[in-house]
Each structure stands twice: as structure tokens, then as C-alpha cells.
Amino acid sequence: MFERLEVMRKTYYALQEKLASGISDVKEITKLMKELKSLEDAVVAYEKYLSLKEQLKDLEELLELETESSVLEMAKAEEKSLESDIENLEESLRILLLPKDPDDDKNVIIEIKGAAGGDEGNIFAGDLFKMYSKYAESMGWKVTLVNTTPGSSGGFAGIEFIISGENAFSYLKHESGVHRVQRVPETESQGRIHTSTAVVLALPEQEDIEYDVKWEDIRFDTYNSSGAGGQSVNTTYSAVRLTHIPTNVVVTSQEERSQHANKDRAYKLLVTRIYDKIQQEQLEKEGESRKALIGRGNRSEKIRTYNYPQNRVTDHRIGLTINRLDAIMEGRIDLIIEPLINEIQKEALEGQSK
């Protein structure tokens, strides 16, 4: 591990020198900056580790020479504290050296669809959208709507949006799956608890992929943007539908005001969907081990239950139950995301040690 960290540190400073040498090529600068950033956390942690090891060495030398009992007592307490800090830092370094998901630093495209439960499923899809929006706001990220299909009684039959921000996908990629809600609908006169579901899909936004997406392979259609009940909300054909004929991937964008902006947004979405389709086909070939490795899991599995009467949320993947549903629906999904990421990292570390 430490040989690898030493190589990373040397590479990090070599990149800094190269950037300081006055490179004018913007693409080259961007590439170097990205590489530098990918090394930064590990290098900073490693240098802190080296500093603590040096402090511990000096302290041990002091303990060998010191005879004053009060000083010895203080030094031994500090030695114990340093050893604990070093042990914790070693664990952090092992995590930082785990294989990285190459998409972690990307923006995330989230699609939510009301599923079982009809109107109540759609209303819950709307609640999930608000939850993710508030979480994004707390992280300083931007939310951009791509498509909305309003539900007849509120919420959304379907909604698609992009969350843009540093490492957004790394935090939200584990949200894909079936989200189940248990509560009494407003229209329920007998006070009975109903169970409904919404399905979430989280994808990394792709700017470019190895697969060659050519405009001549894309069918381009325009139509009127529509609001609730299918009513037209403008008289221009600003909404865009793109169909990639070789893969039969279809995307739409209607939330931008101009056709040009919707076309740009739809193209990015199309590239992302094609990338995802290719990746899913590859995962099927490689089997479940690869799925587990990147931690994205089965999109059809029930991942979480939101129980309103008991103010309880349970994430079934790690057996985590939190009695703070009200806070979570107000955007505090970090209460679930952080333990989930920690558990995934723990499993990855255990896998490496086998």
C-alpha cells in the first residue's frame, strides 16, 4: 500500500510542476487538473500519515530518555492518541485506494416514476423529487428539470431531472431501485394505511462516450410541450424527441424554453442512456460480481421503505432503520447515504483482504 502511495505522491508533485510550467493547451490543462484532483485526497492523507509517524518516532525517543514521572505520563497518553490517529488514518488510506467508479465525479440524471398504487404512487414520486431537490440544495448543487409528466391527482407519473455538482453521482448512484411508502392517503376516509411504490433510476451524465453517436443515426422529432392533463403550454414546437435507431434508445426534453436548448439537453440524455444500455449489457455478460463491485445493484429490488405513521425509514440493503422520516423527506438523506457508502466500502475492504 505504501509503495503505491509513494508513487502517487511523486506523480502528484510532478503534475503540479507541469501545470506551473506554463502549458497553454486548455485540453491538456483540464486533463492534468482532473488527474491532480483524483490524487489529492490520497496524497494529503498520506502526508498527514507520514507526519504523525514522525511525531510518534520523536515521542518514542523522548520516552526512552525521560525519567520524570509526570512528563512520562503525559507522553504516554499522547503516544496512545497518536497510535489511534495513525490506525484510523491507515483505514482511511485503504478506503482511498479502493478501485474508483470512473463515473463518481459526474453529474447525476435521476428519473422517478410512480409505480404501484396509482395516484398515491405518483404523489410519492413528487415527494421523492422534493426530497432529492432539498438534499441537492443543502450540498450546493443545481437541479435542472428535463421532463415532467404530472399525475392527475398531484405528484408525477414521471419526472426526469439533472443534479449538477461535485461528485453528485457518487452520492446518489445508490438511489436506483424501488422505493416503498406506507401511509394513509388524503383520499382515504377509513384511515387505512396503503402501500405504494415509486421507481428511481440514477445515471451518470455522460458528455462523451467511446461509442460513436452519429446524428445521421438519430431521428429528430418536435412537438408542443404539455402540462397537466396533456394541455399544451406553448404554441411552438419546442419539445424534442430523439430516437437512436441502432440501439432503439428514445429520449425527450421539454422543460427548456427553446427547441435548441431542448435538443442540446436531449442529446446529452441520449448519450447517457446509450452508455447505460451498453454498460448494462456488459454487466449481464460479466455477472453479479461486477454489479456488486461498482455498488449499483439490482434496479428492480426494493431498496427502502418509508413508513409515515411510525416516522420510520428502513434501507433494506444494509438493515438500517431511522426514526426520522420527517427530516429525511426534508432533504436529510445523508442520514442514509453516509452509512450506506460506509457499508459498501467496508465490504470492498473485506473483499480485498480475502
Curated annotation (Swiss-Prot):
SMART domains: PCRF (SM00937)
Top-level taxon of the source organism: Bacteria
Ranges in coiled-coil conformation: none
Major location (coarse): cytoplasm
InterPro entries xrefs: PCRF (IPR005139), Pep_chain_release_fac_I (IPR000352), Pep_chain_release_fac_I_sf (IPR045853), Prokaryotic/Mito_RF (IPR050057), RF-1 (IPR004373)
Any one Gene Ontology cellular component term annotated for this protein: cytoplasm
Keyword Endoplasmic reticulum part of the UniProt annotation: no
Record-linked Pfam families: PCRF, RF-1
GO molecular function: translation release factor activity, codon specific
Keywords for this protein: Cytoplasm, Methylation, Protein biosynthesis
Subcellular localization(s) per the UniProt record: Cytoplasm
PANTHER family from the UniProt entry: LD18447P
Known function: Peptide chain release factor 1 directs the termination of translation in response to the peptide chain termination codons UAG and UAA.
Name of the protein: Peptide chain release factor 1
Species assigned in the record: Acholeplasma laidlawii (strain PG-8A)
